[in-house]
Amino acid sequence: MHDPVEYFQNNLVPMVVEQTSRGERAYDIFSRLLKERIVFVNGPVHSGMSHLIVAQLLHLEAENPSKEISMYINSPGGEVTAGMSIYDTMQYIKPKVSTLVCGMAASMGSVIAVGGEKGMRLALPNAEFLVHQPSGGARGTASDILISARSIEATRERLYQLYVKHTGQDYETVQRALDRDTWMTPEVALEWGHVDEIVTTRGADDAE
């Protein structure tokens, strides 16, 4: 069965036509917005999606390593390794990456959102946030299951440290929040240090 998000992006993406000195040029809407240094993290986080996001970030860095990148996030989360590849690339590249949550930043979507540049992590008024510990299924021998459990515990510890670093919360607070599903409104996310500002309209500087 097809992923409805991928189907939409592949088959129902609007086209934008621009007039240039060489005539008309057509772009799909996401390519046109990429020209404006806007990247979308939309839908479940998986390896297919993450490598496209990483490629866009690297392209924009090569194009201009000193100019900000804007990332719009609406994601229910997904694969830890795929999400961490996006997060790590955001930290690795030279341009500052601002994040704006429009819809949902859950699970690995939350990790990507909190990894934006400090002071440039935004949320719209009706955004939702979810933080929790990683989950995984293990099968096989008792030894295999034990190895898998240790790996998940190590991943959980990395996530604890990541949230401590980016939110300013202490380790125990983060540990309690991630112990179970913790949903946050934008106001709670702001208080928690997950975002830096709740925005309702675009600023004058952003509109230019």
Curated annotation (Swiss-Prot):
GO biological process: protein quality control for misfolded or incompletely synthesized proteins
EC number assigned by the record: 3.4.21.92
Keyword annotations from UniProtKB, A to Z: Cytoplasm, Hydrolase, Protease, Serine protease
Keyword Zinc included in the entry's annotation: no
Chief location bin: cytoplasm
Keyword Protein transport set for record: no
Source species, domain of life: Bacteria
Stretches of the chain forming a coiled coil according to its record: none
Family affiliation: Belongs to the peptidase S14 family.
Function according to Swiss-Prot or TrEMBL: Cleaves peptides in various proteins in a process that requires ATP hydrolysis. Has a chymotrypsin-like activity. Plays a major role in the degradation of misfolded proteins.
Assembly and oligomerization: Fourteen ClpP subunits assemble into 2 heptameric rings which stack back to back to give a disk-like structure with a central cavity, resembling the structure of eukaryotic proteasomes.
Protein name in UniProt: ATP-dependent Clp protease proteolytic subunit
